[in-house]
């Protein structure tokens, strides 16, 4: 495998990440980097947090160098409009224009859907805490190296308050 340039986006605000670190818990972006390095060392990974950056001038000029983007979780909810969320939506719009391969996990999906004009709302069924059962891999997914050793149907830990509406 040739070295790939990946951008990992941190979704939590700096105060949340400080709290994680003070309690010996890795941030979402640190956890993603660690997981990826277990899979391969042929990655150049940069981390960016649009919550704490007042300007995207440092990253936008070189954004096309990334072969992919991974946008992970956060304790934020997209419908709780604040400047940190607005910055993330704005940055995701730039990513959607410039990076072809995007993996949006949980919070990342909320940001991507909103940036693309969709809607996310608090689930009327309450929080989903526990195990997501019977996840089915589609035909595209079955050929991806991440899923090559998985069964076509599997279970995974899940924790969600929100749902994509459109």
Features from the language model and the residues they span:
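Short loop/helix-cap segments at secondary-structure boundaries that form the rim of catalytic
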Residues: 58-64, 111-113, 166
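Cysteine-nucleophile active-site neighborhood
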Residues: 74-140
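Pocket-forming structural segment of enzyme catalytic cores
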Residues: 11, 117-166
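N-terminal beta1-alpha1 cap of cysteine-dependent amidohydrolase-like domains
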Residues: 1-84, 89, 94-98
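Short, structurally constrained coil/turn elements
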Residues: 39-41, 114, 150
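Residue-level detector of flexible, active-site-proximal loop/helix-junction positions
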Residues: 13, 52-54, 109, 127, ...
């Amino acid at each position: 495998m040739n070295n790939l340039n990946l951008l990992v986006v941190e979704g939590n605000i700096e105060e949340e990440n400080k709290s994680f670190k003070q309690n010996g818990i890795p941030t979402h972006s640190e956890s993603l980097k660690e997981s990826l390095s277990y899979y391969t060392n042929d990655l150049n990974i940069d981390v960016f947090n649009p919550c704490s950056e007042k300007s995207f001038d440092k990253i936008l000029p070189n954004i096309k160098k990334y072969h992919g983007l991974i946008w992970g979780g956060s304790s934020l909810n997209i419908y709780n409009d604040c400047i940190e969320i607005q910055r993330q939506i704005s940055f995701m719009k730039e990513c959607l224009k410039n990076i072809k391969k995007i993996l949006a996990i949980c919070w990342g999906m909320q940001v991507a859907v909103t940036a693309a004009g969709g809607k996310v709302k608090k689930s009327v069924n309450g929080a989903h805490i526990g195990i997501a059962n019977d996840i089915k891999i589609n035909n595209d997914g079955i050929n991806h190296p991440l899923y090559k050793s998985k069964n076509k149907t599997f279970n995974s830990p899940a924790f969600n308050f929100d749902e994509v509406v459109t």
